[in-house]
Amino acid sequence: MFAFLRGELVTASREEAVVEVSGIGYRLHISSGTSSRLPVPGSPVFLYTHYHVREDLQQLFGFLDEEELQLFRLLLSISGVGPKLAIAVLSGLSVGEIQEAIVSNRPETLFGISGVGRKTAARIILELRDKILKIQPTSSAKAGAPSAVLSATQLIDDAVAALTTLGFPKASAQKAVSKVLETTPGLSVEELVRTSLAAMHNNL
């Protein structure tokens, strides 16, 4: 419904901003990162927006750059992650830090954020890692470092790490991952973890 707002910044706090456009004031929820980069009240401002609607609530979220908006929407695509938690994640770390934690499979970086537990952190990495690799190559890849395509060893390590973070014993995780790769090679990390999870549940 709203792609962006261009107007005058009226007020701003760590969590909200009010922007006047043609005499109408729009209240937007923002991350602390966006808040820290806003101009002083009375200045012109341009914010990308996300309009979130549910049965009992309508909310408008504002972002200074498209990268933050894109990551916000990716976070919303995860089961159990709503806009409040997505903004908390963006407030806890920069976009680059979040992407690096996801690509490098470091859930401990994410569950240091208020409201993000171990299982949520693992789910974020599991569901977004391949998407982040496709849309946002790491700085090392941009600089001509080895391709982001994972080696077999790295693929296994990442899948096992995701499963152990979800609470499965390491030995069981390794066995399930290896068995899946024997029968279905060429999987991404996300696909490998999902297939291994299904196999482990079937054996319970």
UniProtKB/Swiss-Prot annotation:
SMART domains: HhH1. Residues 151-204 are annotated as: Domain III. One of its GO terms (cellular component) is Holliday junction helicase complex. It comes from the Bacteria. Belongs to the RuvA family. Homotetramer. Forms an RuvA(8)-RuvB(12)-Holliday junction (HJ) complex. HJ DNA is sandwiched between 2 RuvA tetramers; dsDNA enters through RuvA and exits via RuvB. An RuvB hexamer assembles on each DNA strand where it exits the tetramer. Each RuvB hexamer is contacted by two RuvA subunits (via domain III) on 2 adjacent RuvB subunits; this complex drives branch migration. In the full resolvosome a probable DNA-RuvA(4)-RuvB(12)-RuvC(2) complex forms which resolves the HJ. This is Holliday junction branch migration complex subunit RuvA. The lineage of its organism: Bacteria, Pseudomonadati, Chlorobiota, Chlorobiia, Chlorobiales. The gene is ruvA.
